From Swiss-Prot:
Belongs to the class-II aminoacyl-tRNA synthetase family. O-phosphoseryl-tRNA(Cys) synthetase subfamily. Its EC number is 6.1.1.27. This is O-phosphoserine--tRNA(Cys) ligase. One of its GO terms (molecular function) is phosphoserine-tRNA(Cys) ligase activity. Keywords: Aminoacyl-tRNA synthetase, ATP-binding, Ligase, Nucleotide-binding, Protein biosynthesis. Homotetramer. Interacts with SepCysS. Pfam families: SepRS_C, tRNA-synt_2d. It catalyses: tRNA(Cys) + O-phospho-L-serine + ATP = O-phospho-L-seryl-tRNA(Cys) + AMP + diphosphate. The lineage of its organism: Archaea, Methanobacteriati, Methanobacteriota, Stenosarchaea group, Methanomicrobia. GO terms for biological process: translation; tRNA aminoacylation. Catalyzes the attachment of O-phosphoserine (Sep) to tRNA(Cys). InterPro entries: aa-tRNA-synth_II (IPR006195), aa-tRNA-synth_II/BPL/LPL (IPR045864), O-Pseryl-tRNA(Cys)_ligase (IPR005246), Phenylalanyl-tRNA_Synthase (IPR002319), SepRS_C (IPR041590).
Length: 529
């Protein structure tokens, strides 16, 4: 909070040591929400796949490759041009694009009568003609499908909801439509786009041409699995020029992959021989990683002159490609590409630190005075914890909401101590379980290896008492707050956030905060006495 600079300057001149010891009084007591580990300063998490994409992009750019966006939609005939006799096998793995046909909607007299009935009025001859023209325009694709409802609403002078009802009731053709496939496909290899791109620019661009693209490809797998996705990212590059050879592929592989921690490299012929590569040029790249040892990370080769000739490309072209997800799996030590790519569908087990941040208090004082009150109750109760009852100790006296309030910690019964033994317990998260434990040898492992929430039973109960005393003072009343035997988190004012509770139950861990607390806090307003 703000403080009087002149007052502290004067105080320091008069009694420096005293002023130094009084320094903490300028601090506003933090609520539990603003205490560690609940208070966190952390950067947002980036997605591992996109982090890898960005790293690959920057590496390619640093190697002098220009970035390119290749076509995603590839016509079937282009696959035949590139793969030759192999095209049929390749097309078995691609997604064809399809769509709903535009129905040829005829409007007979009976249908017009149905529309009139739904509209509650007779259409004019001019409106009927406009209706026919609109449906014909839709058939000819002059009107887009998502605009049809609005256009019909304008013609019929009604609202969109009624038009939807008319289409559903009067024109069943719209409900019985089945998708029809086109001859267009989604790109299954980045190569499909490189032929088209190079065919357009190779004679208009200084050689050698060095391009790269990191983008999405689609492959119709029988099923997705730990190492296969139907939609994946390819990090691909090409070098086109008169003197380009397979040696360029080796050099680019080393330059690109060394940026990701790979050291030694090994190149060996690929048993798969794609027809768009020259014979004996398709090469697998193995690289040694400090953690993973030798791993296959990329493939490169020289495009076949036969395939290049289909696009009028008259210079050799080296192509290198690697799967972004494959590289990310190695980098992030992942064993399932589905979980790496779509973590939201694979609930992550929270760490003890993350669980501790999700445990807070149900009730806390709202005012600064209320926070001071809670700290005072905690301090006085701890100082007199073993005093026998009946007893009462003044903990705090001050103003709340314009009213003078006096607060005491007390034990009204005989043969009982001011506090129960569990008041000193502290909440820890240990191996996914939430435990309230004392400072004793039996629980030393939990206290040493677990994560503290920074919440004690006494502190939580004192905060609840302060919050309720605050509320009572706002209404001009005193109150008595008692916490007895704790069985559930709510008994000691604990709140476990829903995400943390879900993680605890999903992993079959436990919450054990049982213990005798037996704290009584009473507030009075002297003016009411």
């Amino acid at each position: 909070m703000r403080f009087d600079v002149e007052a502290y300057r004067k105080r320091a001149k008069e009694d420096f040591e005293g002023a130094w010891h009084q320094g903490p009084e300028v601090l506003t007591p933090a609520g539990y929400q603003h205490r560690y580990p609940h208070l966190q300063y952390q950067r947002a998490r980036e997605h591992p796949i996109f982090a890898m994409i960005n790293a690959l992009r920057q590496t390619y750019l640093s190697l002098g490759f220009d970035e390119c966006a290749n076509p995603v939609i590839i016509e079937e005939q282009d696959v035949y041009r590139q793969f030759g006799p192999e095209a049929m096998a390749v097309l078995d793995r691609v997604f064809y694009l399809g769509g709903l046909p535009r129905p040829n909607v005829g409007i007979a007299r009976g249908q017009l009568d149905q529309i009139n009935e739904l509209l509650g009025r007779e259409m004019t001859a001019e409106t009927e003609e406009h209706l026919r023209e609109t449906l014909h325009a839709y058939k000819k694709s002059t009107i887009d499908g998502d605009d049809l409802t609005h256009e019909l609403a304008v013609v019929l002078e009604t609202d969109d909801a009624r038009v939807v009802h008319i289409l559903d009731s009067v024109f069943p053709e719209f409900r019985s439509l089945c998708p029809e496939s086109s001859r267009s496909t989604l790109r299954s290899h980045m190569t499909s786009g490189w032929f088209m791109t190079l065919g357009s620019i190779w004679e208009r661009t200084p050689l050698p041409i060095k391009l790269f693209s990191v983008d999405r490809c689609f492959r119709r797998e029988q099923a997705e699995g730990p190492t296969r996705l139907m939609s994946y990212h390819s990090a691909s590059c090409v070098i086109a020029g008169e003197d380009v050879t397979l040696e360029d592929g080796k050099a680019v592989s080393e330059a690109l992959l060394s940026a990701f921690g790979y050291t030694d490299f090994r190149f060996q012929p690929d048993e798969k021989r794609s027809k768009y590569y020259m014979p004996d040029t398709q090469t697998e790249v193995y690289a040694r990683h400090p953690v993973h040892d030798w791993v296959e990370v990329a493939t490169f080769g020289m495009y076949s002159p036969s395939a290049l000739a289909e696009y009028g490309i008259g210079v050799p072209v080296m192509n290198l490609g690697l799967g972004v997800e494959r590289l990310a799996m190695i980098h992030y030590h992942a064993d399932d590409v589905r979980q790496l790519t779509h973590p939201q569908f694979f609930p992550r087990v929270l760490t003890d630190r993350e669980l501790a941040a999700g445990i807070t208090l149900r009730e806390e004082p709202a005012s600064v005075e209320g926070r001071h009150l809670a700290l005072a109750v905690e301090a006085v109760a701890r100082a007199h914890a073993t005093e026998p009852g009946p007893c009462s100790f003044l903990a705090w006296e001050g103003t709340l909401f314009g009213r003078q309030v006096r607060v005491s910690v007390e034990e009204p019964e005989e043969n009982s101590k001011l506090l129960g033994p569990a008041c000193a317990n502290e909440i820890f998260v240990y191996q996914g379980s939430v435990l309230g434990v004392p400072d004793a040898d039996k629980w030393q492992t939990v206290r040493t290896d677990g994560v503290s929430t920074g919440i004690t039973y006494l502190g939580a109960a004192a905060a609840m008492a302060a919050a309720r005393i605050e509320e009572a003072a706002r209404c001009g009343q005193g109150t008595t707050v008692q916490v007895k035997m704790a069985k559930l988190p709510s008994d000691i004012n604990l709140q476990i956030r829903e995400y943390a509770m879900r993680s605890i139950t999903d992993t079959k861990k436990k919450i054990d905060v049982r213990g005798p607390v037996f704290l009584t806090v009473r507030s009075v307003i002297p003016d009411n006495l």
